[in-house]
């Protein structure tokens, strides 16, 4: 009988019995884990609580049914005062209440001292206290309410200025602003130094011998009027106009009489300090005060002639021997400029009839602007053909749009290019068939000249 029993079946029966017994012991609802099963050293990664791990069934993130609601420990009635009430006044105050009463009486005793100080600063006589205690209440009211000196309202107004003077001052201020804005830093420095002087010093230094009309109850001051010349903005000294003062209540006849008696005085050139700082001066016109000051054109005291700037291929006028008006000139550029191209042609020999007036030498003067359609002839290169023919001449014309057009012309022969002063002694009256010896130039130079002139003509035709 014992040999027939299978050990495996017996083991299976034992496991079933144990599981059934555990199921019977398990409670129906969720139960709280015992405190001995919690380990504070463990921390759950899902919920972040201590005492269990992420694998534990006690984690509320895994099993929401097993999550426990935290129970309240009890109500705290003293936390919130839902029924506030005021404590009643006790008939027999204790020691604490007595201390409070003493603290309140001390500031009342200090009231007379404060009152005396306030009377000293305010200057009011002290008030006598009344027997019924009204003085104490008034003193406390005086301390509580901030009182100060009443503002004094005056009816006096500012004197109104004469409309003529106000208009003139406005125009003078605007003129002064425009003059200061247009001045250079050196002019501003000199102007500030001149304006720092007193009005009496300026009057005596600028024009000390200017007669003034003797009019009763009227004061005139010199008024500096400066107008910049049209030639250059830096050619004249600028002075800040002085404001002229007039008295009120003058008749129109007195004003007209003062204007009739006003002398026209022309002042001397600018002071030496201003001339040294600026380099140029101006004539100033002085006049007595009126509605509009008399203005006169002012010319520069020192107008130095400007030296004409010469281009890289231009010739000074002192080296030219002369020629007829409007005669074409044959110029020869230096050998270093043979590789520049057609862009240098407008600067090589720009000469007008006004620049060559006669055969005799004359001092240099300012060159006028070149007209838009005035021709200027010159030789392009000192190159001649290989068979000893005439050299080339190029005629340059200035178009309306500011560009230049060139054309080839026959020209007389030139001297050797080794002598740069040969073109100075040549006369512009040489005929086309000159008897001067010709210079033989290789054909490559001639071909280069023709190529340059043709390219310039093509560019001009494309632009047109």
Curated annotation (Swiss-Prot):
Residues 74-83, 97-114 have a biased composition (Basic and acidic residues). Pfam families: zf-CCHC_6. Residues 180-197 have a biased composition (Low complexity). Residues 16-42, 71-213, 228-247, 254-273, 309-389, 418-437 are annotated as: Disordered. Signal peptide: none annotated. Belongs to the FAM90 family. Primate-specific FAM90A gene family, thought to have arisen during multiple duplication and rearrangement events. This is Protein FAM90A20. It comes from Homo sapiens (Human). The lineage of its organism: Eukaryota, Metazoa, Chordata, Craniata, Vertebrata.
